[in-house]
């Protein structure tokens, strides 16, 4: 997730950048990196949805050790989150000056790093929060014996770790993970749009000090509803029995947890069927409601769908499916677009969106 986000943020790639994946085996730095399934080449979005180690390694190497290290620490790794609990671990990322080529390559898909589950979930929450990292906390308020609130904790933004555009693109690509073609299809929940990522990591063998070929951790992290996130869930299965893959053992557990939590938290369903657009705040503009069926039909016909009224996250999610680069002006909701709705896309390579903030 974070290597791709860093490369997008640095302008090195787009969701449709094609990465040569070497048919499943690639020698780098004197070692061979493998993919579970051999791929000839993949788009950036497919590197994520198909969990290509080789694709991620090539992207990380294009960033270089110092830049990749700097961007990983920006996401909150290698230092405590400062949650309101004692004894928190900072995790461990070796200094960039100690990274060899193979270290940069493997760090790009999460190997050779030590991060806590809390750090990982908080970093994914930054994607869900439009690029803003929020300090996690456990206790929301403290009450006296009479039930009076004597202290209340408010959500605290630490800072922006990626642009809203990068966060929106990452969300759209993470949604592809939870499709029939992605590795996280077993995390799909009827009526909800889920953005997520599977993980399968080798553990260190304490006897040899090298990565074990028998001991693994399987994981799935995701947030939902993807277009208006309210819940981040991380499931880690230590030394799973049978299948070792996150998509097989952790994704179903994510689904079970989410299906139990959604009704308890009062998070409504129906997001998969409909994108409810906002009223445009521009004087004289008409409110727009774009159904997913209408958008899908426009995409099938290779015509520009109507984006007015959508948030930046929603609009970029649609455009990523078209393979269009996008220039964004302003923040908030789309009030103007070029190409216009219904226009054919033959020969069109880019799109311009103008946004304005929602009126209170």
Give the predicted meaning of each segment.
Residues 188-191, 235-239, 243-248, 253-360:
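Ligand-recognition elements built from short beta-strands and adjacent flexible loops
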Residues 1-237:
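Beta-lactam-recognizing serine transpeptidase/beta-lactamase-like catalytic domain environment
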């Amino acid at each position: 997730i974070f290597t791709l986000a860093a490369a997008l943020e640095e302008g090195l790639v787009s969701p449709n950048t094609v990465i040569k994946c070497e048919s499943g085996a690639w020698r780098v730095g004197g070692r061979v990196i493998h993919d579970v399934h051999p791929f000839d080449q993949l788009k950036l979005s497919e590197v994520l949805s198909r969990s290509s180690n080789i694709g991620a390694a090539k992207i990380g190497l294009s960033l270089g050790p110092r830049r990749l290290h700097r961007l990983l620490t920006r996401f909150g790794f290698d230092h405590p989150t400062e949650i309101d609990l004692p004894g928190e671990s900072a995790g461990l990322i070796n200094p960039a000056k100690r990274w060899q080529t193979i270290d940069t390559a493997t760090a790009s898909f999460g190997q050779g790093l030590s991060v806590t589950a809390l750090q990982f979930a908080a970093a994914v929450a930054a994607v869900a929060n439009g690029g803003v990292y929020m300090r996690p906390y456990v206790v929301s308020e403290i009450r006296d014996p009479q039930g009076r609130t004597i202290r209340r904790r408010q959500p605290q933004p630490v800072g922006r770790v990626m642009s809203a555009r990068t966060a929106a693109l990452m969300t759209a690509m993470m949604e592809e993970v939870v499709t029939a073609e992605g590795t996280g299809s077993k995390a799909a929940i009827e009526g909800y749009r889920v953005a997520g990522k599977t993980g399968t990591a080798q553990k260190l063998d304490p006897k040899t000090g090298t990565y074990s070929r028998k001991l693994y951790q399987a994981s799935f992290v995701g947030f939902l509803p993807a277009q208006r996130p309210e819940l981040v869930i991380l499931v880690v299965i230590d030394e799973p029995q049978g299948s070792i893959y996150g998509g097989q053992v952790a994704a179903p557990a994510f689904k079970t947890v989410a299906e139990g939590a959604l009704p308890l938290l009062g998070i409504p369903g129906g997001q998969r069927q409909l994108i409810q657009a906002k009223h445009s705040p521009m004087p004289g503009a008409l409110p727009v409601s774009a159904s997913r069926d209408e958008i899908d039909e426009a995409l099938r016909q290779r015509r520009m769908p109507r984006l007015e009224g959508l948030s930046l996250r929603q609009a970029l999610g649609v455009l990523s499916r078209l393979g269009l680069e996008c220039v964004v002006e302003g923040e908030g909701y789309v009030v103007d677009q070029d190409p216009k709705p219904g226009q054919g896309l033959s020969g069109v390579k880019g799109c311009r969106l103008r946004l304005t903030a929602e009126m209170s």
